[in-house]
Regions:
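A non-catalytic, helix-rich entry segment at domain boundaries
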Residues: 86-161, 245, 249, 255, ...
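Active-site-adjacent bridging/hinge elements
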Residues: 57-68, 104-108, 174-187, 236
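Short, contiguous acidic/charged loop-to-helix segments that flank catalytic cores in large enzymes
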Residues: 74-79, 120-128, 158-164, 189-202, ...
Length: 297
């Protein structure tokens, strides 16, 4: 609560308090703080109404975790994010024409520098990451046999309603011979969901909604009359499967996208506050703020 505290100090304090509260240490839980038992303000925050696909997914799962979850993340989460960032950098570099071997060498060197593990574990991590990059490269090569690469890391800024604007970056955008666009989203996790989950995948649906209200000028997707679509695909080169993992989503109808779009304005309201919803979902057991969540016993 010290206004002079920095962002790092506040996050560390929140992380430690969450751990103390989980251990039932008296006074650690915010409910036991007399100064924190009432609402500090009733005035909503001013927001732009911009939502990224990942933000939409997080807010639909649990608004409370979407807003506060990052203050209690552990160091392993940071390493996972850095691993994903480097893999995406490689995917982008080869898409822009950089020599794949040179790009891999640079990314592997960066990945090794962020490791703080024993030598035996380092070798395993390097081999695993190298395989992920090789499989991502192979998927990219195969995907361009019958389709044209329209762009990589494409900025998206499309207003889909008066209240909501979708913003973010598409990893890749492919175009078939008839001019239909396919959204490609690279996932760097070690496991992939069941194929049936693709049809309802929120991030792909959000990208499709943006394309349905957008136009592509060769560099970015902006407000427009709508683009012809093939749907979307999640690519999992790091999954422990023989074949490179793919989860597909078909081209959604205007009715399906309209129904999905109706879910978004309430998410903007959640971000504005001053009150926010806590919602049970399948990830509650591993939520970093479970110990202070009002819907958990």
């Amino acid at each position: 609560t010290n206004p002079e505290s920095g962002e790092v100090e506040r996050k560390q304090a929140a992380r430690q308090l969450a751990r103390l509260a989980a251990a039932d240490i008296p006074g650690a839980h915010p409910e036991q703080w007399w100064s924190a038992r009432s609402v500090a303000a009733e005035t909503p925050l001013h927001t732009s109404g911009s939502l990224s696909p990942s933000r939409v997914e997080a807010l639909l799962n649990c608004p409370l975790k979407a807003v506060l979850g990052n203050v209690a993340e552990d160091p392993s989460t940071e390493e996972h994010l850095l691993r994903g960032t480097l893999a995406h950098a490689f995917f982008e570099a080869i898409g822009r024409g950089m020599d794949a071997e040179k790009a891999k060498l640079l990314v592997m060197e960066a990945f090794e520098r962020i490791q703080d593990v024993p030598q035996w574990q380092l070798r395993f991590k390097l081999d695993e990451f190298s395989t992920l990059l090789d499989r991502a490269r192979e998927w990219a090569r195969q995907s361009e046999v019958n389709q044209e690469l329209a762009g990589v890391e494409i900025p998206v800024g499309v207003r889909v309603s008066e209240e909501v604007r979708i913003g973010g970056y598409m990893d890749r955008l492919l175009r078939d011979g008839e001019g239909n666009y396919l959204v490609v989203d690279l996932k760097t996790g070690r496991s992939k969901p069941a194929k049936k989950e693709g049809e309802d995948h929120v991030q792909l649906m959000t990208y499709q909604l943006a394309l349905a209200h957008g136009a592509f000028d060769g560099h970015q997707v902006h407000d427009g009359e709508g683009m012809p679509r093939q749907g979307g695909v999640l690519v999992y080169p790091g999954a422990t499967t023989k074949k490179i993992g793919e989860i597909w989503q078909s081209d959604k109808s205007p009715e399906a996208l309209e129904e999905f779009a109706a879910l978004l304005p309430p998410l903007v309201e959640e971000m504005r506050g001053p009150r926010i919803t806590a919602r049970t979902n399948k990830d509650c057991d591993k939520c970093p703020i479970r110990s202070i969540c009002p819907v958990q016993e």
